[in-house]
C-alpha cells in the first residue's frame, strides 16, 4: 500500500511539472510545450526522438513493470522538461548567470530524483536496470554545456553499458523483454548524440532575435518541482528588538535628539575651562589625578556566539546478512570479523554494500560478487564463475582461495587482490582507481606484491592512438 501511495505521489509531481510547463506563457519566454507544428527543426527532431526510442523504452519498461516502470516515468518527465527548454531556447535569447540556472533547475532536480530512486531501492531485483539509468541520466545535462555536449552524452552512455551488460548477461537466455529494454534505452543516448551533432554541436542553440528568457513563473522553486501555487511573498521585516530600559530610554533619546537639533546654539551652554583646570598647564592637578583612563574603544559589532549546533542523528541502516531469492545481501555491517556464508549455490550472487571494518568469508562456488561502497573490508572466497567487482570502495582486501576469471576494480582507492595458484590467469580490469596491488603466491607460502599501473602515455602513430604504461623510477 505504501508503494502504491509513493507511486501516486510521484505521478502527481510529474503531472504538476508538465502542467506548469504547458501553462507557461510564451510572452514570458518560459518553458513552452507547444506541438511540433510550427516549431523550429531542432524541436521537431527532438519530438522524433521522443516518439521513437523513448516511446519504445517506455513500452518495454511497462512490460517489465515494477521499479523499472516507475523509473522510466521519471526519465520521461525529465525528457519532457528538456523538450520544453528546447522550445524556450528556440524562441528566446540565452539569459545570463543565475537566470540560466533557474531555467535549468527543473531538469537538474528531475535528474536527482532519478538518481535518488536507485539509491532508495538497492534491494530491488531490477537493481542493474535502475543503475544503468541512474549512471547515465546526467546526459540530460548536456544543455548546460558550453562546448562539446555530444562527447559528454557518449560518456554517460558508456557508463550505462557497464550495467546493461549485466542485464544482458542475466536475462539474455531467460527473458527477451530485458534484452529489448537494453536496446531501447541505449538507443535514446545514441540518437541524442546524433541529434546534438546535427543541431547543437557547440552547445544549446538559442534564438538570436527573441526576448531574453526570464525566470520561470510557472514552476515553483523548491527541492522538488511539482504542482501547486507559487510560494507566498515574503512577510514584512521583523519589528525592531525592544530595549530593556523601557520608557526611561525613550525619554532620554528624545532629550538627546532635542539637544542635537539645537545646532550651533548648543555650544552656548558649555562652560569656559580656565588654565588652572587644564592638566597640561597645572602639574599639581595632573599629580592629583589617577592613572589616565583610556577612552572608549571604537564600536565593533558583537560577534555571535557560535555554539556548535547539534547535528541531526544520521539514521543507521540495519545490518543485513540474508538470502533474497538468488542474491546474498550483506549490508551495513560494521566492526564484524566473523561473517561467513557457507550455504551457496552456483546460480547465487553476493552483493556487499556499505560494510566498514568487516571480514566476510564466502564458501563454495558462487556466480558473482559485488563489493559496493565499502571501507576496510576483508573478503575471502573459494570460487567465482563470473566476476568479482569492487566499486566506490576504500582499503579493500580480496583473497581468492580457488579460482576466479575476472576481478574488476572501479572508482576505488586502495585494493589488494591475493590470488591463489589456480587463479594466476585472472584478468584484473581497473578504471578510475588508485593504490591497487596484486599479490602472487610463492613456493614458500608467502606473496610477492605487484602494483597495478595507474599512469599511462598515449601517442599518435599516424594511424591510431597507442597507449603504454609509464614507469616512474623512484
Curated annotation (Swiss-Prot):
Gene3D superfamilies: 2.160.20.70, Adenylate cyclase-associated CAP, N-terminal domain (1.25.40.330). Residues 228-242, 299-311 have a biased composition (Pro residues). The modification Phosphoserine is found at residues 34, 289, 294, 300, 307, 309. Its main location: membrane. Keywords: Acetylation, Actin-binding, Cell membrane, Isopeptide bond, Membrane, Methylation, Phosphoprotein, Ubl conjugation. There is a cross-link at residue 347 (Glycyl lysine isopeptide (Lys-Gly) (interchain with G-Cter in SUMO1)). It is found in: Cell membrane. In all cell and tissue types examined. The modification N-acetylalanine is found at residue 2. It is a peripheral membrane protein. GO terms for molecular function: actin binding; adenylate cyclase binding. GO terms for biological process: actin cytoskeleton organization; actin filament organization; ameboidal-type cell migration; cAMP-mediated signaling; cell morphogenesis; modification of postsynaptic actin cytoskeleton; receptor-mediated endocytosis. Residues 215-252, 277-316 are annotated as: Disordered. The modification N6-methyllysine is found at residue 286. GO terms for cellular component: cortical actin cytoskeleton; cytoplasm; glutamatergic synapse; plasma membrane; postsynapse; presynapse. Residues 216-227, 243-252 have a biased composition (Low complexity). Residues 312-452 form the C-CAP/cofactor C-like domain. It holds the Pfam family CAP_N. Belongs to the CAP family. Directly regulates filament dynamics and has been implicated in a number of complex developmental and morphological processes, including mRNA localization and the establishment of cell polarity. Homodimer. Binds actin monomers. This is Adenylyl cyclase-associated protein 1. The gene is Cap1.
Amino acid at each position: 500500500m505504501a508503494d502504491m501511495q509513493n507511486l501516486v505521489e510521484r505521478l502527481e509531481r510529474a503531472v504538476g511539472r508538465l502542467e506548469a510547463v504547458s501553462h507557461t506563457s510564451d510572452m514570458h519566454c518560459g518553458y513552452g510545450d507547444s506541438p511540433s507544428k510550427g516549431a523550429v527543426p531542432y524541436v521537431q527532431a527532438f519530438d522524433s526522438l521522443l516518439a521513437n526510442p523513448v516511446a519504445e523504452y517506455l513500452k518495454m519498461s511497462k512490460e517489465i513493470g515494477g521499479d523499472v516502470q516507475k523509473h522510466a516515468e521519471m526519465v520521461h518527465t525529465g525528457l519532457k522538461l528538456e523538450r520544453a527548454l528546447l522550445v524556450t531556447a528556440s524562441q528566446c535569447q540565452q539569459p545570463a548567470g543565475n537566470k540560466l540556472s533557474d531555467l535549468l533547475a527543473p531538469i537538474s532536480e528531475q535528474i536527482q530524483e532519478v538518481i535518488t530512486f536507485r539509491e532508495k531501492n538497492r534491494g530491488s531485483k531490477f537493481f542493474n536496470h535502475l543503475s544503468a539509468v541512474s549512471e547515465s541520466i546526467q546526459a540530460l545535462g548536456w544543455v548546460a554545456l558550453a562546448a562539446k555536449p555530444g562527447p559528454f552524452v557518449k560518456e554517460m552512455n558508456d557508463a550505462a553499458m557497464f550495467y546493461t551488460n549485466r542485464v544482458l548477461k542475466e536475462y539474455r537466455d531467460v527473458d527477451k523483454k530485458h534484452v529489448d529494454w537494453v536496446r531501447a534505452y541505449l538507443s535514446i543516448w545514441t540518437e541524442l548524440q546524433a541529434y546534438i551533432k546535427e543541431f547543437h554541436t557547440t552547445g544549446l542553440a538559442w534564438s538570436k532575435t527573441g526576448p531574453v528568457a526570464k525566470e520561470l513563473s510557472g514552476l515553483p522553486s523548491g527541492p522538488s518541482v511539482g504542482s501547486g501555487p507559487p510560494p507566498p511573498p515574503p512577510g514584512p521585516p521583523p519589528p525592531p528588538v525592544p530595549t530593556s530600559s523601557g520608557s526611561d530610554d525613550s525619554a532620554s533619546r528624545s532629550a538627546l535628539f532635542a539637544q542635537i537639533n539645537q545646532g550651533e546654539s548648543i555650544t552656548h551652554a558649555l562652560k569656559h575651562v580656565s588654565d588652572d583646570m587644564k592638566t597640561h598647564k597645572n602639574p599639581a592637578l595632573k599629580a592629583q589625578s589617577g592613572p589616565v583612563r583610556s577612552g572608549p574603544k571604537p564600536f565593533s559589532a558583537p560577534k555571535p556566539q557560535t555554539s556548535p549546533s547539534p547535528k541531526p542523528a544520521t539514521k543507521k541502516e540495519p545490518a543485513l546478512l540474508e538470502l533474497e531469492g538468488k542474491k546474498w545481501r550483506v549490508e551495513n555491517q560494521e566492526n564484524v570479523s566473523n561473517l561467513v556464508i557457507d550455504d551457496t549455490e552456483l546460480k547465487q550472487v553476493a552483493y556487499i554494500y556499505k560494510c566498514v571494518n568487516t571480514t566476510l568469508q564466502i564458501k563454495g562456488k558462487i556466480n558473482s560478487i559485488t563489493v559496493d561502497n565499502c571501507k576496510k573490508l576483508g573478503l575471502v572466497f573459494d570460487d567465482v564463475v563470473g566476476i568479482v567487482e569492487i566499486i566506490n570502495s576504500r582499503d579493500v582486501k580480496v583473497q581468492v582461495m580457488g579460482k576466479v576469471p575476472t576481478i574488476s576494480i572501479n572508482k576505488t582507492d586502495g585494493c589488494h587482490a591475493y590470488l591463489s595458484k589456480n587463479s594466476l590467469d585472472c584478468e584484473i580490469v581497473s578504471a578510475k582507481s588508485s593504490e591497487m596491488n596484486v599479490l602472487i603466491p610463492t613456493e614458500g607460502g608467502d606473496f610477492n606484491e605487484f602494483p597495478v599501473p595507474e599512469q599511462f602515455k598515449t601517442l599518435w602513430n599516424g594511424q591510431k592512438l597507442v597507449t603504454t604504461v609509464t614507469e616512474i623510477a623512484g
